[in-house]
Each structure stands twice: as C-alpha cells, then as structure tokens.
From Swiss-Prot:
Its EC number is 2.3.1.129. This is Acyl-[acyl-carrier-protein]--UDP-N-acetylglucosamine O-acyltransferase. Pfam families: Acetyltransf_11 (PF13720), Hexapep (PF00132). It comes from the Bacteria. The gene is lpxA. Its main location: cytoplasm.
Length: 263
C-alpha cells in the first residue's frame, strides 16, 4: 500500500475522476464523487459526501457527516454544470450542507478562507461567503446570499434569498434577515431582524481604534436614530465619508442595495 492509500480509510469510496493531493486524509464511509479536487492538508472525516464539480483548497477540516457540493435545492435547476468553490483553512462541522450554484444565479457557490461553519448549517446555491466568518449551529442561508468578511451568524439565525450581509456584522440568535444588513451593524436576537447598534465588541476584537468606532457610531445614529428619510441620511453620510474609508464602505453598501435595507 502506498503512503497516500494509507491515509484513505478502506471503506471510503473515491470516484475515478476525483483529484486528491497526496496528503489528503479521508475517513470511514466517506464518498468523494467525480470532478472533485481537494488540495493539500485537507482532512475529510467519516460519513461525508462530496459531489462535484467541487474545488476544495488547502488545510480544510470536515469533521464528519457533511453533505458538500450537492445539487441546488432549486426547482429551476435542470442539471446544468455548476460548481462549488471552497478556499483554505475552513472548519466544517457535523451535518453541514453546502450546495452548488445554479445556471441562473451565476453557476457558483463560493466559500472563502478561515471560516467556521458549525453543525447543521445550510448554505444554499449561489451564496458567496467571504473570509473569517462564523456560522453557529443551525444557521441557514437561502439562495444568492452574499456575506462579507468577519460576519457572525448566531445559532438558529437565517437570511432570506438575495440578501447581503456587510462586513463585521453580527446577527443575533434566532434572527431572520429579510433585507440587506449594513457593515458594522448588530442585529438583535429576535425574529424581526431589527438593528440594535453597531457591533462594538466585534470591532474592538478586530483592533478598530476608538476613533474609528466613534465615527461608525455617528454614522449609525445618522442612519437609524435621527429619524431621517433614507435619501437625507445618505446625504449626511456622504459628508461623513469624505475622509473616512469605513463610512465610504457603509455608504457604498447602501447605494448598491438590491433588497430593502434593514432599518
């Protein structure tokens, strides 16, 4: 038995067209389907299924029982070639499901680097997840959701299709998101998805200076507390954004919203 074969449990099934780096480990009763590529350092636990076309990067850990790269749960899907792209250094826990894209939605579902995707999370077709995100147990994304870097989804939270979640946002436990969530925003733990302030603790953990946090708080008050019509709030944010990249990011997010902004 060669060295690579010794890293693959004898009960695992590897399709002929799957491509595995020499040090990839495959656990018991796992199925790796056709057109799957897995890069170096990745560990696939027991009872996982990975269907292609799927590309998985370096140093990922699939703990077990995950269903990855399955067909999209979309009645419009007609078997067209679509794919799932997963980056590096992600941890994907038990019973996670991540589906491939659809032809009508761009054809790709993508997961970035350094994400923690915890048990029973579902990431649907055509979603795009950035880097350093956390999806706590039972979080769910409907199709076509875009999630920026450093976002945290608490347990049992979810996002409606086509929503965007801006960078550094925090989604509270059990919250259902049905609109775009601006960067830096904290959404309260209720089913209505109401903004409760900025993600102050998260920004501190990411080494935002007090000055940056103060400016973001001012922008939040302009958008949510002052009672201004959105058009007027955007005018004031444009003034605040002249010398502030964080507020520029916030304003650009608002101006490119595809769904109603959570307010």
């Amino acid at each position: 038995m060669n060295k690579h074969a010794s890293l693959i449990h004898p009960t695992a099934v590897i399709a002929p067209s799957a491509t595995l780096a020499p040090d990839v480990q495959i656990g018991a009763f796992t199925l790796i389907g056709n057109d799957v590529q897995i890069d170096t350092g990745t560990i696939i636990g027991s009872h996982c299924t990975i269907h292609g076309p799927t590309r998985i990067g370096r140093n990922n850990r699939f703990i077990g029982q995950a269903a990855i790269g399955g067909e999209p749960q979309d009645k419009k899907f007609a078997g067209e070639r679509t794919e799932l792209l997963i980056g590096d250094n992600n941890t994907i826990r038990e019973f996670v499901t991540i589906n491939r894209g659809t032809g009508g939605g761009g054809g790709v579902t993508s997961i970035g680097n350094d994400n923690w995707i915890l048990a029973y999370t579902h990431i649907a077709h055509d979603c795009h997840v950035g880097h350093h995100c956390v999806f706590s147990n039972n979080a769910s994304l409907a199709g076509h959701v875009t999630v920026g870097d450093w976002v945290i989804f608490s347990g049992f939270s979810g996002a409606h299709q086509f929503c965007r979640i801006g960078r550094y946002a925090f989604i509270g436990m059990g919250t259902l998101i049905n609109g775009d969530v601006p960067p830096f925003t904290l959404i309260g733990s209720d089913t209505l998805g109401r903004p409760r302030g900025i993600n102050n603790e998260g920004l501190k953990r990411r080494n935002f200076t007090p000055e940056r946090i103060t400016a973001i708080k001012r922008a939040y008050r302009t958008l949510y507390v002052a009672g201004l019509p959105l058009a007027e709030a955007k005018q004031q944010l444009a003034e605040q954004a002249k010398d502030n990249d964080d507020i520029k990011e916030l304003l650009q997010f608002i101006e490119t919203a595809q769904r109603p902004l959570l307010r």
